[in-house]
Amino acid sequence: MEGDQFNLAESIFSRSLMTVPNVGLWTIYLNYVRRMNDLRNDATGNNRTTVSQAYDFVLNNIGVDRDSGTIWQDYMEFLRGIPGQIGGTSWQDGQKLDIMRKAYHRAIAVPMSTVSALWKEYEQFETSANKLTARKYIQERSPIYITTRSAHQVLEHIHRGLDRSTIPKLPPKAGFEGHEEFLQQVELWKKWIAWEQSDQLVLVKNGESDVYKKRLLYVYKQAVMTLRFWPEMWVDAAEWCFDNGLEADGTEFLTSGFAANPESCLLAFKYADLLEKKSPEAGKGPKERGEAVRAPFDKLLTSLYDLFKQVKAREAKELVKVEE
């Protein structure tokens, strides 16, 4: 955002935010919103409302990330500045208390490096709000914090060596340099996904099925961002979504996965199967259904023929070099 190129920045955000679940990018977006809405010059309170909405938007999308701790801490600092006095008796004081308590409850349920610091803040917050009720609230949340803290330690071990790059790499051919390392990355991603599926945070049992699904969906989005050219990961993500009632997300995984890997037979068959199942729902006749199902296979064959032509052209060039 150097040179005050705000229109360009907003264009980048509109194109990339919802497709790139990266804490760094979302932090830049949040800083941009805060820069454009100065809280020091906010007589109407509109700027604070805009920033508050931005925090909600960011945390709803990447707040489950283990690297989102700094954003959560910044958010709590922002909430301390809203009108009202913790421990006060006015309606405004009570409103601020409820907002901050809800935010702390969300934060201490996320396995991240700052969870212990946030827990200490929460204890101080409840004590300053009401010493008589502080013990009750702290005891209620203590098991969640202990589970979260332990989960963070496990995730830290799982993430050791994991490449969460937003720049995807083509899988090296078997026997070529980097092939074994790439497969190791695939296994690390699978290990993280398996851990999330095992529900070590006890979310489903505690009635937090939506959070459980949100966490897994987020991990799958992270995985296909790095393993963009690994078809099996797209298929795994889609099938998990279909098994858990996330039809739209499952369809998006198959559509995006096939767009990224048009030469993948696996994705072509899975996508065609999806189209075949959806055709009756869309009221299509036999001919239209046949055309819809055929489209992925046409795309697959075109992509494979194109690859074949590229290989032949490369061989011809190499042959010319040898003859020279």
Name every feature range the model reports, one short phrase each.
Residues 1-324:
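Polyampholytic low-complexity alpha-helical segments
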